[in-house]
């Protein structure tokens, strides 16, 4: 792109994008339209634009048949400024980089669309100081201004390190622009750093100027070539990367933030028919287009992925896309400047650029803060907690508006749950605060009371000494008191014991112990609210009441036995009190330990009972299922037995019928009928003839056959019954096995569900406890951190104030020294100047005499000069009047000339019209046209003659003006000669005066030089010391960095090991669970297979049973038939007495058969009853087991209660034993101390007086300490108020500083825009001047190229215009200098 074209570009103004967006980290897209250059006209003179800006966020592409409208984050027109582009696009990205985010800015567009101008600025000037400098230099300035601001705010607690690298992608090869000898570099990927270039030079910079030097050094190595569309076309993609590392130290933790700012200038897409590229240029264009097409494919794939499609993003197809992977859909905040050309000849490339920008706008990145915190574990944990709290606050207050309805519902539910949780959290926090306040109050109370106890201990020691002394005296003077005196002494001692007991009862430590006991009782009460514990406690209370009653009776009997012995004084003195307190302490500790043990045992017992309950529930479930199965089986057996009984009844009836019916016996007729007598032969013959058939049918069955038949039937029945019993046994066994398997399966399923529920409940409890502990820890750590930060801040302020005071003291001492040296030098100089003054006074007297002579001659010359001045004024007035007249005439002539030019133009147009008319109507009006032309020519000649006359007049006036100017110049020369004489004389005098001043100034300059040299020497020494200190600090920093790096590596190794252990543990648990699940599945599968086998076997047995039943049915049917026949025979027997009867053994056999059948029926009923009895027995056993379980639970509770009760009784007996021992000791001491009671009384009174005095002294000391404490408290309050005031002052200064910084940035941007506006106005003036020259030349060509007077007039006008423009340029230059000085200030 030509530099002249680039300088005409204007940038986008800001409006809305300084603030970070709320809609994730979507890529920001800004469209910039470059202005159309002067050479944009086509061959036939047309100039058309294919774009128009509708608003700050929309533009329209004029396409046929329908125009297209595009919406972006910002649309810049042709007349926007570079400062506006920077404030809109780059400011927010640079601020994000300061906060720890990665940022990328790159320009995209066709060749010649202004990408390099947008990123760098004009190429034919110093970009870093030029008013039209681009985004990259302005980003440097703003970045380092933010760094300086952060350093000023944080001081030595925050440091920054900036490193620059500059690479280019040329023909799909990567080259380092900072190393001209570099060959193709390679891209590598790191898990934390992301994609980086191996071997790229990174140069450390400390200011914007150094960064720009690095940029310009690399820019000179970039590949640039000329094409038909752009004189300086970029042939490679350039990526300038700034790595910003900030290290902030807060107490013991070190926060390190690392961010990357990528500033990318892409090469433009090209068309060979437009650029006419050949050879190497064509190859370069192909590689550029290929990489840009890969970039477009990546953006399309990212858009599809964002819409929910499964797409592979081809980052590795091009070096450019792989290098910018984090900027496109990764960890970065990205801004794209799409540069387009408004010309209609670039319509295709403009449309493709806008489509690319519209697709890129849909991509959303995932930018995160690249921060690493180093320090000790507590600080890191506190930082993690703080960040978690910030995250929870951020998530609680943020709602994305553009989500779907389902997500809105889920978020609404989540917000409700979160609000409830926050309410509970606030309540818990309030309760915790109240408890903490209560604890602090109690701790203060305990501290005060402990002090009081310490004072009482001192008193007690004194009393013990006095008691020992009294005991010695008592031993020496035993038996000297009367009984009345002894009684009185004993009463006084009892009163003292009573007061001491009251003191013991109201002792603060006892109150503390009472409070602790109260809290423990509350916990115990909560534990006692459980139902089994309540029952046990009721029993315990009854037993305790009985035991206490017995103990009170025993103690009363013991006290009665001991008599009316008085209490000795030694027993009630302070040692016993302290022993009792120590015992109470021991008892309290024992109670606490026992309570903890009981709690632990209760938890263990609870866990055991819970496990047993789970097992019993599983057994109960399995037994219930087994019970159901047994009930079903019982019902089935009942039905089966009922059917069998009915079938047996039917068989019995049929057998009876078969037995009673006769059978045919043709062969047995002769054998069974006996020989008849002759008397009855005829009668028998008649009977036999009358019914032969009936005789055969009514022939009785022989007993042998009936017995055989019955035996066959009974054998068949027996075999069938045996088979049936065998099958029934097998079926029962299989059902029993099936029942057991089913019970096992149910038990396992129930156990697995219970274990899962238990696991989930324990996990939830553990997570809740962990969360509670974490919240408590985070709150405490936050409070501690806040206190530490306040303390550090105050310390830093005190340190700064001390430094300021020290520096002020040093400056004051230096000023005093300088003042003393200056005073001495002034005195010396005054002495020297006094000597010189005398010498100069003499020289002045001589010069005064000479001056008087010169004044006389000057007076003469002045008179002549005044005369000449008056003459010159008169002549100048005359000439000025003539000049004004000439100017007026010149103006009139100009207006006449303008009118003539207009007439000439009109005549010219009319002439053209007439020529056209002449061509059209050549034959009709040729003579009239010729006459008109002649008249026009005559008028033209007259006008030309008139113009020549006027030009001659103007020339004469100019000659007269020149002559007058010559006269004036001569007069001025004579005046200047006179002035020169006067000035020479005055100069001589002035030289004499200045010689003395110069010498004094020389002395001053020498002194000043000496002071400058000394200052330079001291500055050089200070610089040397500073450099040494800086080197030392850098070495220390390097050592610290090495140490932090080592610690970081160690921490990472430890974390890796922990993660590996966690992974191994998780894999082991997973393997165990998978094995257990496999075992369970195998067991279930085997059980299912066995069930299927059993079912198949049951079906086979059922089939056989059905076959057997069918056979039995057939046999029964046969048996029934026989029984019917038998019954028929039995019925017909009385009618025929002469026929043979059924044998008696047949009836007995039938009775036996019936008995067996009845016995079988009874057996079935008995089996049914036995089954019912078995079921009832199982139910009874289950109830018995449940009762036994409850009884065992009750026994456990009772055992626990008895244990507690026995422990309490043991403690009470121990207490009573100790009290009994004390009472015995007291009795012994009282028996010894009775004789010396009076003396003891006196000594006690003296001791009491001394104790009162000591008590008063202690009270006074305590009051003094209270007053001192109040004074210290007031001083502390004043200090706190002062600290609060100072913190408010610091906060106010911070707000003022931020406001001043913002105002400064706004003024700077406005100033930059003014500079750009001025440059633009200068360019527009230059363009207007060129147009004016062009029009003047055209005017001269049209009018005055044949007239010398007109040429002279034209030259004069040009001179005047040139003078005016020179004056304007001088004004603008002065204004520019003024603005630059103001900017420097």
Swiss-Prot record:
Expressed in sympathetic neurons. This is Kinesin-like protein KIF15. Keywords: Acetylation, ATP-binding, Coiled coil, Cytoplasm, Cytoskeleton, Microtubule, Motor protein, Nucleotide-binding, Phosphoprotein. The modification Phosphoserine is found at residues 1139, 1167. SMART domains: KISc. One of its GO terms (biological process) is mitotic spindle assembly. SUPFAM superfamilies: P-loop containing nucleoside triphosphate hydrolases.
